[in-house]
Amino acid sequence: SRAPRSSSPAITSTSLPTDVVGLTCEPIETVRIGFIGLGARGTEAIRRFTYQKGIQVKALCDLNQFRVDSCQNMLSRANMPEATTYYGSEDVWKQVCERDDIDLIYIATDWIHHAPMMIYAMEHGKHVACEVPAAMTLDEIWKVIDTAERTRKHCMMLENCVYDFFEITTLNMAQQGLFGNITHVKGAYNHCLYDIWPDYNADWRMQYNMAHRGDVYPTHGMGPACQLLDIHRGDRMKYLVAMDSDPVSLPDYLDK
């Protein structure tokens, strides 16, 4: 597998011209968006965007027609132009990425499709915003980074917890110097999903948790912690250690 870049000297915009951490692009007066994945997260994103100025929803894509129709109705109720709809085929999302009248692809599908969709969208000239986690393996992460650097497209993982009130207040306090020189942070995220497990299409999230051990979804705790430590803004991770306790309650839940 590919060696991590952190084994090399620190990456800066001067030592690595292709770095996209500080990427800037020409402003877009009206951002034209294609949405892929219209489950709970995607539908909520559509609702939020009905309140945004300077955007146009150009495409709605999901495996299921009823979800596409529901989001189309949401646009109609907000007096927004009708979007082109895509559904039914597992590969129909590629047609959204291939359009020449879309600036941004917003991805809210199951996890395993995130990286391939991000890469395909950037390769077709689109900026990308993707729900967490952005990728499921280190190889996928590097492919996403390489594609962003090569295509010079924005590629953002939508880690929402860094914008929550507690986290953003804590970050502001840290940046104001209230905690002095920060040398240690802790982050955690506890969320019981028992009530919503059945809502995931084809039970994909439960199936992934059954097949994989460890913290498969660490971004809610890690994102705010990285901001407090100025990761990618003057500091970097050299290594990462993950530990896993026995899954006790989930097998009991499955038995029931």
Label for each model-derived stretch:
Residues R2-C130, D139-H154:
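N-terminal glycine-/serine-/threonine-rich beta1-alpha1-beta2 phosphate-ribose binding loop
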Residues G37, R150-M156, C161-K256:
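Predominantly a Rossmann-like dinucleotide-binding segment in NAD(P)-dependent oxidoreductases
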Residues I107, A134, D215:
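Flexible, glycine- and charge-enriched loops at secondary-structure boundaries
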Residues W111, A134-A135, A188-L193:
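Short glycine-enriched loops at secondary-structure junctions
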Residues E131-P133, E159:
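Short beta->alpha connector loops at strand-helix junctions that form conserved
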Residues A134-D139, D164-F165:
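Conserved PLP phosphate-binding loop immediately N-terminal to the Schiff-base lysine helix
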